[in-house]
Amino acid sequence: EFIINTPFRAAWKDYIGNGAVNGKAAVVFAHLITKGVDHGVHAFYVELRDDNGFLPGVGGEDDGVKGGLNGIDNGRLHFANVRIPRTNLLNKYGDVAADGTYTSSIESPGRRFFTMIGTLVQGRVSLDGAAVAASKMALKTAIQYGTERRQFNAASDIREEVLMDYQQHQRRLLPLLATTYAASFAHDELLTKFDDVFSGADDTDENRQD
């Protein structure tokens, strides 16, 4: 059997979907240690609760009011020496025999870890792209409005000034525009590396760890 334990606060997992109230089980990524050797992060199937609440050793709380999506159950989980069967190790990429011997078809720990969490990485990359796209759309609207909307007389008594001619308006928007440009370039670079790894064009341990 394995023992799942989060001995300190930083080992807890926060903002888990269905973690605070509804989830009955979870795939827990934890360091796999056998015979005193840490084989890196692996995935374990862990039951969380039954109809009466959390199972022994499992704890969790709701993450409280968020900035949005408060209809979604988000919570934190922690474990106090929860024992699970050896067969609860999701062992496609690494397995442990009854005597504690570890084997894996992927020799490199970095490559093994990236292979296991590849789907999660893809989700993070997509989230980054969505955030950049949202920033672009918001700034496009704000800057376009600022170049068309006129307000207050300045140099002319006949025609009001466009908002973007005011320094205060520029100072609020242009730094955000520069940051969004930088984020967009960084995201494009990330996508290139991500595609190189997953397509096999440049699948190295260094790129996987990056």
Give the residues covered by each predicted segment.
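Flexible, small-/acidic-enriched active-site or ligand-binding loops
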Residues: 55-81
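Structural beta-strand/beta-sheet cores of well-ordered domains, especially the beta-sheet scaffolds
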Residues: 24-28, 39-42, 73-80, 86, ...
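A short core secondary-structure module
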Residues: 5-59
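Charged, glycine-rich active-site and insertion segments that engage polyanionic ligands
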Residues: 209-210
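A glycine-rich, basic-preceded beta-loop-alpha segment at the flavin cofactor/substrate interface
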Residues: 16-18, 78-123, 143-165
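Amphipathic, small/basic residue-rich leader segments at the start of a protein or domain
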Residues: 2-3, 195-206
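Extended amphipathic alpha-helical segments enriched in small hydrophobics
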Residues: 118-200
